[in-house]
Design a protein with these regions (language model features):
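Catalytic cores of glycan-processing enzymes that make or break glycosidic bonds
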Residues: 1-254
Length: 254
């Protein structure tokens, strides 16, 4: 049903085709659960059939804990992988060049479950998480702030290394805020990915800071109710956004 009106379908947590962690009501916590396995070969066969019937591409959100061999199995059925820039790091902590992403994948900078680019860079998500009581103590929060600072520097180093920022652009994140130059450079950078598909968040083009969803919350935050900062008729006429999309189109064609 979901494929009938779209050319592509993204399956959230595609590992559910293989297994799900079930927690009985009687368990004291999530640790009292167990994996329940599903007939993945049958489900993949049905998925492939419906994909052909509806002429829809399938993207599998294969993040988190991924059992060995599953990505290869999904690839055999032409299910596209999902590569998020923030998660694509090497053993030394540096960011993998989007040019090295798998071809059979959809590349993206961030997702609906992550902060916007401005929110990430300014650590708005960490402060909001503190307000919502998402962290067990201040020590955990301090560690997250330190990790974020290091990640930002690695991102900036990578952007300079790929020459997507002006040569005279700041090279230290110590006092560097997120501006339009940096924002759009990150989007152009991931647009150069070797992956066949690209997904970008409209709120990043609009330079919005508030997230649309915060995992682990329900009534604490108005998930999925945040509106875009500009109506369709307005942002489609924005010269900077039009130039950004034009630059992205050129990079996707190369």
């Amino acid at each position: 049903a979901n494929m009938q009106h779209a050319g592509a379908l993204r399956i959230d947590h595609v590992m559910a085709l293989l297994r799900l962690w079930w927690v009985p009501k009687t368990a004291e916590n999530a640790g009292g659960g167990a994996y329940v396995y599903y007939p993945i070969m049958d489900l993949l066969g049905i998925l492939a059939l419906e994909s052909q019937r509806n002429q829809a591409v399938i993207i599998g959100e294969d993040l988190g804990t991924v059992p060995d061999g599953i990505r290869e199995l999904l690839a055999q059925y032409n299910v596209y992988s999902y590569r998020v820039f923030f998660f694509e790091t090497a053993e030394d902590g540096g960011y993998i060049s989007p040019a090295h992403y798998p071809v059979q994948a959809m590349a993206t900078l961030t997702t609906h479950d992550l902060p916007t680019l401005i929110g990430f860079w300014h650590c708005d998500d960490l402060r909001l998480g503190r307000e919502l009581g998402l962290y067990k103590d201040d020590a955990q929060l301090h560690q997250l702030f330190a990790q974020r600072h290091a990640n930002k520097q690695r991102i900036l180093d990578s952007l300079h290394g790929h020459h997507v920022l002006p040569q005279d652009f700041e090279r230290s994140v110590q006092h560097l805020g997120m501006d339009k130059t940096l924002n759009y450079a990150m989007q152009r950078h991931v647009a150069s990915a070797s992956s066949q598909l690209l997904c970008l968040q409209l709120e990043d083009a609009l330079q919005m800071s508030q997230p649309v969803n915060i995992p682990g919350t329900s009534t604490e935050y108005p998930n999925w109710r945040r509106k875009l900062s500009q109506p369709l008729e307005q942002w489609t006429q924005d010269a900077d956004i039009k130039q950004l999309f034009s630059d992205i189109s050129v990079r996707r064609q190369n």
